[in-house]
Amino acid sequence: MASTWAIQAHMDQDEPLEVKIEEEKYTTRQDWDLRKNNTHSREVFRQYFRQFCYQETSGPREALSRLRELCHQWLRPETHTKEQILELLVLEQFLTILPEELQAWVQEQHPESGEEVVTVLEDLERELDEPGEQVSAHTGEQEMFLQEMVPLGKEGEPSMSLQSMKAQPKYESPELESQQEQVLDVETGNEYGNLKQEVSEEMEPHGNTSSKFENDMSKSARCGETHKPEEITEEPSACSREDKQPTCDENGVSLTENSDHTEHQRICPGEKSYGCDDCGKAFSQHSHLIEHQRIHTGDRPYKCEECGKAFRGRTVLIRHKIIHTGEKPYKCNECGKAFGRWSALNQHQRLHTGEKHYHCNDCGKAFSQKAGLFHHIKIHKRDKPYQCTQCNKSFSRRSILTQHQGVHTGAKPYECNECGKAFVYNSSLVSHQEIHHKEKCYQCKECGKSFSQSGLIQHQRIHTGEKPYKCEVCEKAFIQRTSLTEHQRIHTGERPYKCDKCGKAFTQRSVLTEHQRIHTGERPYKCDECGNAFRGITSLIQHQRIHTGEKPYQCDECGKAFRQRRKTSYKEILLKNHSEPQAGVNLLLSSLIPEWQSCCRKDL
């Protein structure tokens, strides 16, 4: 790119405004007219129109005239109908009202109508809500932002959209995964090379970019090869292979055959002899032009035989077919989990390495996946449009609402492949799987038990007696936050876990699960000594004390020991003593003390 955009407006009061765009040296009037029709140049004029300052002019008349000319260059009433101009204005306002974290990303897709924006956002919402190959509490392993014509593997490249760089620099999209290029190149051969070249050309600056970007990307932009930032600043042979293959003199790219070398050298100098008749964009290879023209014609020749969905490029179709085949060729060396996409594996590996590339601009919290950041941002905006009809709780995502509804229905769709245990939430499954995935490597020095890192911290509170979670109503303290949440339902009266069979509600999910076994007759906990079976693990533990003779609950007054910590029913006390009210009250008070402490307090 010769230089950055510069606009100069010189006007006398009696002369028409003259706007000069200095980007390239156009040799003919036809070149300039063709360039004027480019969508990106219209975007430049729109930016100057919106950001025009009154102080830049000598007076109000000049300011008005310059605004008129900039608006004319943007909307172009000589070529656009009223409906098209109206659509441009609606599109601009639509992009303006989008959440800030979405604006820059949507504008990178270069939508030309409001309908295109809607399609992009609906596709994004569907991908965010899909369970996919999930490995974290927030999202799954998904390529949410890889649409058909979005570049793959441009790691380290800054966004070249004028809007994202100038108007909203702090919402630039984080880099995508560069490894995808290598994988897809192997799978699809030269087809991906063609697509990669076009993507590189489409990512050339069209707006008010800085010379810094041009210097950093001068090599990679010429030939479409991708380099990491450190590779660009170091030796140009960083991408060449160790086995002395022919390399390009321009950038050190390895080439396997002489034909590849000839073709590659024609691309590197920037020769672009194939021009698009619709928008004027030029390409170095005819195949790139053909694929680009499908944007204008709407042609999608590559059709999936399974679902009928069509695509503009063969590479995108190949990537799509993995959904139907269920193939998962990319395997994690740490835990053995397999994925259908390289990017999914790459994101998953961040769980092991601890890398978190995506940061929240509001609170600084970091995430390993882009979807996790998007969901987190909604917390700050308090955007919770999805409401549960059972308990009226609201959620920021439809997928979270669906998971929450499992609390009421008892559905547990997330099952562990190792032990078969099922969970309502995917995050609970992920935490559980740490047990199987060699995460249980932190040992308690007090008792020798092993836990995950977070599990060890909670466990050690048993030995230290620390109870950091305190109830504000009764000041009772707990070791875990979940225990505090369950306790607080005593004060609020909330019983979110309801039985579908009899309608009875409970404060804890585990109690509901145990209750439902009354209806199903299931008794999964069996005593090894006598064969008796029980609905709950607590009942089994209490029963086993009959065989072991264990009595862990001891009275502080007399030393008498008990197997259970049982309290007498309030209703039972009042019914038995209805003729002697004072006796009933005394017994009711004594029932507030556990059985193993009330044996010596007969004076109540």
Curated annotation (Swiss-Prot):
Subcellular location: Nucleus
Pfam family, one: zf-C2H2
Annotated CDD domains: SCAN (cd07936)
Crosslink position(s): Glycyl lysine isopeptide (Lys-Gly) (interchain with G-Cter in SUMO2): K20, K25, K196
Molecular functions per Gene Ontology: DNA-binding transcription factor activity, RNA polymerase II-specific; RNA polymerase II cis-regulatory region sequence-specific DNA binding; zinc ion binding
Repeat as UniProt keyword: yes
PROSITE patterns: SCAN_BOX, ZINC_FINGER_C2H2_1, ZINC_FINGER_C2H2_2
Family the entry assigns: Belongs to the krueppel C2H2-type zinc-finger protein family.
Name of the protein: Zinc finger and SCAN domain-containing protein 12
Species whose genome carries this gene: Pongo pygmaeus
